[in-house]
UniProtKB/Swiss-Prot annotation:
Protein name: Putative uncharacterized protein YLR252W
Organism of provenance: Saccharomyces cerevisiae (strain ATCC 204508 / S288c) (Baker's yeast)
More details: Partially overlaps SYM1.
Amino acid sequence: MSLQYFGTLTYLIKTQRLWRKTRYLFIIHPWSNNWIRNPDFENIWNSTSIFIRPCSLGYWNSIYLIDFRQRADQLHKYLSHQSWLAICFSFTDVLGQEQFI
């Protein structure tokens, strides 16, 4: 994912253009793009962070789940931190359908 795309998405969130249709947002640590989806995916909606061990790496990779309704005040903190680059995908409220961004 390019930095230009990341900056554009950050702008959309800050201006709330993405806010109305997006409820959750995953951010993955840039040190690894090889991660395993949590098998208990349906049970982590109330979490603020989960930790997943990638197959080919020897350290823990962290993926943060942001709930826009509860964590809106910390969006800028997460998105502007230089250690976080890649936003993987978001989830809509509409029928629980997954929407890739």
